[in-house]
């Protein structure tokens, strides 16, 4: 698959994942790769106050792409997240196949389009909590 990284169309999202060729619905776009970690390490890392690129494969296995910027799948953004733009919707899903995760097209995707994938409600709930916590800490610092 011919994919490239450039500025996302979503405000504040940073970089995004784009395709240079048309992708058919149900095609595997790219494997989500990173460091493979166990459940206890997953729980430890989710308590940290930094960006997260964690994908929970199953009860005892997780992929963490935080320190693997060379793997392009981590740059796929969620069009249904905190920052949304009218007319932009997710066009792919995460799907697991054994111990691997792939981003799979949920519709035909045109050449030049950004790849958007659902991060899940629990991810965004966690992000909102973290943002509230940071805001509260910043407010208390000012006092």
Protein language model features and the residues they cover:
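Short aromatic-glycine motifs in intrinsically disordered, low-complexity regions
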Residues: 8-19
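Tight coil/turn sites that cap or link beta-strands
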Residues: 23-26, 112
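Polybasic, lysine-enriched low-complexity intrinsically disordered terminal tails
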Residues: 25, 82, 139-143
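Short, compositionally biased
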Residues: 37-52, 126-143
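Acidic glycine-/aspartate-rich tracts in secreted/extracellular proteins
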Residues: 34-36, 81
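Catalytic core of the SET domain in histone-lysine N-methyltransferases
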Residues: 1-10, 50-125
């Amino acid at each position: 698959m011919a994919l490239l990284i450039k500025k996302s169309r979503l405000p504040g999202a940073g970089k995004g994942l784009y395709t240079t060729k048309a992708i058919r619905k149900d095609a595997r776009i790219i494997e989500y790769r990173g460091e493979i970690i166990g459940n206890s390490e997953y729980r430890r890392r989710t308590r940290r106050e930094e960006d997260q690129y964690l994908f929970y494969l199953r009860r005892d296995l997780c992929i963490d792409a935080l320190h693997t910027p060379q793997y392009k799948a981590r740059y796929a953004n969620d069009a249904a997240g905190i920052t949304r733009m009218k007319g932009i919707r997710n066009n792919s899903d995460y799907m697991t196949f054994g111990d691997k995760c792939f981003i799979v097209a949920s519709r035909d995707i045109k050449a030049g389009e950004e790849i958007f994938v659902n991060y899940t409600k629990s991810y965004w709930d966690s992000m909102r909590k973290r943002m509230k916590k940071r805001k509260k800490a910043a407010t208390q610092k000012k006092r």
